[in-house]
Amino acid sequence: MRRIFLINLFLILISFNKVSSQSAGDTVAYLLTCGPGTETYSIYGHSALRIVIPEKHQDSVYNWGVFDFNTPNFVWKFAKGRLDYMLVAQSLNSFLGVYIYEHRYVYSHKINLDANEVRKLAELINENLKPENRKYRYDFFYDDCSTRIRDLIEKAVGEKLKYPQPEAGKMPTFRDMVAKYQEPFPWLRFGVDLIMGSTADKKAVFRDRMFLPIDLKNELSETLVYRSGKMIPLLQNPEVLVDFGSPVVKQNFFTSPPFVFTLAIILIMIAGSLIKSSKTIRLIDIAIYSVFSILSILMIFFNFFTDHLQMKWNLNIIWLNPFIFMCLIMLILNKSGTIWFRIVFIISAAFLLLQYVLPQDFNIAFSLLTIILLVRSSVRCEYDWNPLTLK
């Protein structure tokens, strides 16, 4: 859904075409849904609006998923949540060309709008195309290429639009929604679960689910619109514009985070019992605590120094707490630091016991990583009852 045009972006874009509202009776609007790819930015798919005006021979696609990769301080702005996306207009052929090249399907659904609604939609798009309006601050859950289309349709159709009644069954969370697209990519899911906070565990009602392109298509397919005294489907006339199946990604359990971290626990425990050199053990612990310290710094950054709402209130900061960094300093200085290791040990044990009652869903790999912290901190706690304590 994040349309990062890594090839020269502006070679495929045309000028910002206005939508003519003078021929609204002949104008047809389509929802374009693009399939997921295998790159990180493309696994969620993409959405765009297509407007066709037959008498003017105009066939344009309006795409809210573009940003300029050459933006100054791009990486920093992206991490801080201050990267602006923009609306661009392009020809249908240039839009489809990207998906043909990437072997990703593109589905089209006609949006059932009357002449007044098409005119209103055209006015809204033209207003959005103005230079002062075409950029917007991207928000993964609440303001992206899909929610922009949803909002325009709602404004154009008004009260004649009817979403299905709230379902009685279990509502998915935002984390659940994105996780289904991450299943073929366990390391990506690990990373996303790591940086997304408890706000991602909010229940996603019907309208909220439209932040994902394929879900936008699915939810609008269940949506009705009032026409001539009866309710009819909002989307109709499904068509395949680019015919590729969903990508097949081979998974290997032996490279997945749970297997890798389980193996790491075993190797660390074996090393701790077999290696007699305290210097070697200290170097191993420095390496381990360095990794956890970096992750702890990331948790602090995403909790307190980013505008990404999805990363706020991230309870992973419990097991990736700043005390880990103090342990690293003690190891580097070759000091005992018993108090710091005891704090990390207690917090790690508490997290493993209480994680299931916390208001955040934790990846199983986090428990395995916490066990590594628990084991290595227990070794340096200097508890008399602990047989692993360094002598």
Give residue ranges: language-model regions.
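A general structural signal for short secondary-structure junctions and capping/turn motifs
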Residues: R2-R3, Q22, T40-Y41, V52, ...
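Bacterial Sec-dependent N-terminal signal peptides
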Residues: M1-Q22, P387-K391
